[in-house]
Amino acid sequence: MLYFLPTPIGNLADITLRTLEVLERCEVFLCEDTRVSKRLLHLLAKNPIISHSFPNIAAKKREFIAFHSHNDQEFLNQIEPSFFDKEIAVMSDAGMPSLSDPGMSLVAYALKHNLQYDVLPGANALTTAFCASGFLEGRFFYAGFLPHKSKERRLRIIKILNALAYLEEKTPVVFYESPHRLLETLRDLNDLAQGMHLFAAKELTKLHQQYYLGEISQIMTQLQKSNIQGEWVLVLLNEKKIEPSMGLSALLELDLPPKIKAKMEAAMTQKNAKELYFQRLLEEKKQCD
């Protein structure tokens, strides 16, 4: 039997009883990082309440196998479905497997080979941040992690805002972001969604948990003077009516080289990138003249 287990996103007390029961009886662990999973089991075993009810939570005769985005396909190509006749747990470093973490390819494998599996509910930053945002909408769009590079990130934001333009009601967008790119992402969001409100959550469930709410520019100002180390969740409220053409017009106003702008415009409009490139060059030449 294959189990997808939620792990605490910061507070060890958020582990569930069902997860503890499965952890105690599993023989094999497929882990995003084996070191992190072993440490989690060690910490759980040190808790007197947990160790009393689950004395074998950190039994030594376990097999820990790395399973992450860099090796998942190779791993699945090498094993036989009979491998899953054992009791096997799938664990990410924190939160729910398959939710911006390894696991989805394994679910697909289980479905393809008619394997039994179970997904246990539990802690995750996505729903925790949305519920903490105070935005009244009962739905949200999950965008996961944005691209690392600014031009790809801006294009992704434009596409998301364009998609939301066709919805009748407000739909908050939830992003995950690292501290290394947080301020850059906020600058891009402010350029493309200026005036919109944002809820930013730092280090959810941890000792230094912090909430910020306001217009994007206000949060940028606050965070430029703050310690931003830690994991972040951003919830953007598209409270203004966005016209479908907004994405293209916003793109054309960006201070980008003509070649990059042409490629991004081509991706949005299905036009020829080379023709658009020469068109942008002519426009810039006219402006200079």
UniProtKB/Swiss-Prot annotation:
Q: Name the GO cellular-component terms.
A: cytoplasm
Q: Which GO terms describe its molecular function?
A: rRNA (cytosine-2'-O-)-methyltransferase activity
Please give the Pfam families that the UniProt record associates with this protein: TP_methylase
InterPro entries given in the database record: 4pyrrol_Mease, 4pyrrol_Methylase_sf, 4pyrrole_Mease_sub1, 4pyrrole_Mease_sub2, rRNA_ssu_MeTfrase_I, SAM_MeTrfase_RsmI_CS
* Matching Gene3D superfamilies: Cobalt-precorrin-4 Transmethylase, Domain 1, Methyltransferase, Cobalt-precorrin-4 Transmethylase, Domain 2
The answer to whether the entry has keyword 4Fe-4S is no
- Give the record's keywords alphabetically: Cytoplasm, Methyltransferase, rRNA processing, S-adenosyl-L-methionine, Transferase
Role: Catalyzes the 2'-O-methylation of the ribose of cytidine 1402 (C1402) in 16S rRNA.
Identify this protein by name: Ribosomal RNA small subunit methyltransferase I
Write the lineage as a comma-separated list: Bacteria, Pseudomonadati, Campylobacterota, Epsilonproteobacteria, Campylobacterales
